[in-house]
């Protein structure tokens, strides 16, 4: 080490940061510390070490080293490096606090710092801080930079201020392709696909990001055929290759929309480009493979997700987290527990790992393993976070251990948030714990007075308890305040197109055929033992049992499945996506439909996947 100059050490650290060589960089740090070489000149090597750790995502160490550097020896690069690294690794609040500190200590704010600040505000969708940042940029005189203006437009676009985006765009003397793309993304998000298409055709030049925005827009609208045509034009006619950022963005859009057809197209493209499977898989390859694992799991094909995972030559903790989250959604908690030892031999688990494992235990009712996992957090150098407590409360609640769940919730180091309280309220509903539910409901109403879901859940509990008068009063109060429940919406992919249904929907072009099929389905499953579960429906003076049953029959997922039965060949699996939790009646009905029609029916609701096959569900009625 003595033969190494300071310049060479600095270059080595930069090389380790650039190539993500974390272990060699740490070893070099250790040698510097023990050899005494780190002591001088301080501003030369300390800054290099800090920048290495910040670039590598080791933010705790980076912050410590940054704090050790005297203020007089910190330059703009140090401040902006820490600022951008906080943003890159999701520590957005830290970024904001650091920017405030920079202003307080009169650190020179340049265009790089402002662009980073705007990016943080865009991610947080914090309009107040965004406008403050805009004011700072005006004072600093950096709005002459196209790059800064593009970041400013993107920030306002993420916050929904479309008119402000358009105003800034019109005032730009130089409109780059990035400027156009930011406007396109904003318009597609807030004004719709039709208006976005107009902007897309107006663009004098289109980059890969602009094409990806349009592809994601069509994916969200369910236009599979148009997506494939766009991809063909983008790749084969315009020559825009899909890099790992574009591929991951498209796979994320496929996962959110449930579009398996386009997801498979992207998978084939990645294979042809020899991504993911090479012996020397890069970080980019790992991210594409991880996005595929996530996409297949969220599109209901957990077997393909597992296959991609097994074929990856290199995996990181994000890959494992994606797989565990997917397995949790599919109710395969035991598999997650069995694979955990293999994971810790490959990578170090993080907070998200334990959230996924605890979620898997919750969806599978594995209480003892869940407790062991929760208590092992500190063994891996982690402190239990709110998300971990939320999973444990959910696990105990689902298992019927309501009192134990409430005790754990009250012992949390921070007050329970809406997720934790909402989870416990749901468990109270399932297990009929009205007294505890009433306490929880009062806390939830204080947090979110406009949320109808909790009050609807309470009214259902009162009905089940035979207290319909209280339920009627609760719902009547909501109606007087003009508060409506969130409507249930279901979508199904048939013949490369998405078809959406709401409860009692009659807007579909084939409504008459769908309702004829619905009548046939109800008649056949009644003969097979189906009895409508009306226990959660509030009685009204003008309603009777027949009307209640009719309302249940027209739930959105039943309409979607009936359309699927009409439009697909026998034995074709049906995949339905619902925005809310599937109700008890639809769950019971789908089990019988799967047996009577010999169909596999997969429904992804707000919480998890339900795979109905041969008269049973993959959740084992534990959901």
UniProtKB/Swiss-Prot annotation:
Chain positions of PPR repeats: 42-72, 75-109, 110-144, 145-179, 180-206, 207-237, 243-277, 285-319, 320-346, 350-384, 385-419
NCBIfam families: PPR
Stretch forming the signal peptide: none
UniProt region (Type E(+) motif), positions on chain: 496-526
Gene Ontology molecular-function annotations: RNA binding; zinc ion binding
InterPro entries assigned: DYW_dom, E_motif, Eplus_motif, Pentatricopeptide_rpt, PPR_At4g14850-like_plant, TPR-like_helical_dom_sf
Family that this chain belongs to: Belongs to the PPR family. PCMP-H subfamily.
Protein name as annotated: Pentatricopeptide repeat-containing protein At5g15340, mitochondrial
Record region (Type DYW motif): 527-623
Lineage: Eukaryota, Viridiplantae, Streptophyta, Embryophyta, Tracheophyta
Keywords: Mitochondrion, Repeat, Transit peptide
Record region (Type E motif): 420-495
Residue range of the transit peptide in the UniProt record, numbered on this chain: 1-16
């Amino acid at each position: 080490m003595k033969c190494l100059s300071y310049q060479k050490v600095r270059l080595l650290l930069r090389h380790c940061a650039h190539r993500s060589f974390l272990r060699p960089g740490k070893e070099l740090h250790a040698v510097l510390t023990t050899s005494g070489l780190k002591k001088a000149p301080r501003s030369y090597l300390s800054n290099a070490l800090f920048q290495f750790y910040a670039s590598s995502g080791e933010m705790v160490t980076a912050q410590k080293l940054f704090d050790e550097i005297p203020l007089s020896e910190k330059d703009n690069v140090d401040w902006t490096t820490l600022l951008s690294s906080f943003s890159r690794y999701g520590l957005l609040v830290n970024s904001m606090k650091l920017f405030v500190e920079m202003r307080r200590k009169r650190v020179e704010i340049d265009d790089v710092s402002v662009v980073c600040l705007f990016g943080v505000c865009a991610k947080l969708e914090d309009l107040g801080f965004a406008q403050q940042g805009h004011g700072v940029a005006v004072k600093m005189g950096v709005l002459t930079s196209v790059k800064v203006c593009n970041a400013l437009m993107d920030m306002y676009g993420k916050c929904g201020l479309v008119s402000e985006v358009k105003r800034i765009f019109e005032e730009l003397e130089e409109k780059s392709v990035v400027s156009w793309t930011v406007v396109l993304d904003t318009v597609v998000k807030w004004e719709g696909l039709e208006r976005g298409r107009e902007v897309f055709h107006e663009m004098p030049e289109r980059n890969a990001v602009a094409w990806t925005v349009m592809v994601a827009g069509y994916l969200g609208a369910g236009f599979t055929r148009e997506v494939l045509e766009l991809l063909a034009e983008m790749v084969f006619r315009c020559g825009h290759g899909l890099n790992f950022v574009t591929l991951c963005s498209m796979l994320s859009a496929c996962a959110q929309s449930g579009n398996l057809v386009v997801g498979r197209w992207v998978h084939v493209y990645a294979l042809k480009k020899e991504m993911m499977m090479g012996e020397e898989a890069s970080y980019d390859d790992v991210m594409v493979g991880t996005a595929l694992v996530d996409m297949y799991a969220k599109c209901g094909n957990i077997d393909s997700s597992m296959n991609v995972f097994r074929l990856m030559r290199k995996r990181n903790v994000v890959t494992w987290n994606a797989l565990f989250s997917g397995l949790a959604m599919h109710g395969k908690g035991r598999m997650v527990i069995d694979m955990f030892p293999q994971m810790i031999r490959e990578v170090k688990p993080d907070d998200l790992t334990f959230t996924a494992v605890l979620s898997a235990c919750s969806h599978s009712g594995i209480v003892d393993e869940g407790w062991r996992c929760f208590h092992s957090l500190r063994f891996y150098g982690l402190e239990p976070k709110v998300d971990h407590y939320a999973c444990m409360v959910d696990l105990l609640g689902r298992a019927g251990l309501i009192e134990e769940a409430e005790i754990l919730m009250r012992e949390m180091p921070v007050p329970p948030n809406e997720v934790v309280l909402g989870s416990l309220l749901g468990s109270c509903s399932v297990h009929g714990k009205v007294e505890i539910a009433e306490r929880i409901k009062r806390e939830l109403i204080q947090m979110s007075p406009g949320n109808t879901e909790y009050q609807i859940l309470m009214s259902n509990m009162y009905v089940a308890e035979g207290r319909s008068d209280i339920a009627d009063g609760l719902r009547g109060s909501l109606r007087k305040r003009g508060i409506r429940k969130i409507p249930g919406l279901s979508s199904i992919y048939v013949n490369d197109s998405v078809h959406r249904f709401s409860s009692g929907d009659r807007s579909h072009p084939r409504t008459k055929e769908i309702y004829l099929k619905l009548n046939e389905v109800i008649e056949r499953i009644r003969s097979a033992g189906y009895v409508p579960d009306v226990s959660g429906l509030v009685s009204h003076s003008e309603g009777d049992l027949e009307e209640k049953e009719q309302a249940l029959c027209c739930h959105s997922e039943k309409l979607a499945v009936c359309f699927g039965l009409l439009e697909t060949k026998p034995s074709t699996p049906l995949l339905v996506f619902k925005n809310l939790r599937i109700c008890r009646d639809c769950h019971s009905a789908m089990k019988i439909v799967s047996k009577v029609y010999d169909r596999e029916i997969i429904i992804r609701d707000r919480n998890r996947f339900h795979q109905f096959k041969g008269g049973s569900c993959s959740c084992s009625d534990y959901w």
